[in-house]
Amino acid sequence: MTRAKSGKISKNRHKKILKLAKGYRGRANSCFRVAIEKVEKALQYAYRDRRNRKRDFRGLWIQRINAAVREHGLVYSQFMGALKKAEIDIDRKVLAELAVNNSDGFASIIEQAKAHI
């Protein structure tokens, strides 16, 4: 029986990992053993941060809404409570977008919310 070697398969696997490690510093972009560790860690960070990004953007939207609402003499928590009472269902992403790009529209929403405080 002849010996079976995995030449093509392992070469392709090495090539795939080294391609993912392109741009890494030191031996991490040329040495397979180091590269595989760095690529695995990078993929772990990417997985974690895809979830953290959602958290970070929600915090950013809240900060923007709070800053815009304070210009009109309210606080974020009061404003959100008033929106609930006024039955205005606009999510934080849209509110933050309005606060930054359409201050007149946002001011009218604040006036509607103030009526329900």
UniProtKB/Swiss-Prot annotation:
Cellular component GO terms, alphabetical: ribonucleoprotein complex; ribosome
Classification via Pfam families: Ribosomal_L20 (PF00453)
UniProt keyword list: Ribonucleoprotein, Ribosomal protein, RNA-binding, rRNA-binding
One GO MF term attached to the UniProt entry: rRNA binding
InterPro entries: Ribosomal_bL20, RIBOSOMAL_L20_CS, Ribosomal_protein_bL20_C
Annotated signal sequence range: none
One of the GO biological process terms: ribosomal large subunit assembly
HAMAP family linked: Ribosomal_bL20
Protein task: Binds directly to 23S ribosomal RNA and is necessary for the in vitro assembly process of the 50S ribosomal subunit. It is not involved in the protein synthesizing functions of that subunit.
Family annotation (NCBIfam families): rplT_bact
Family recorded in the similarity comment: Belongs to the bacterial ribosomal protein bL20 family.
Protein name: Large ribosomal subunit protein bL20
Gene name per UniProt: rplT
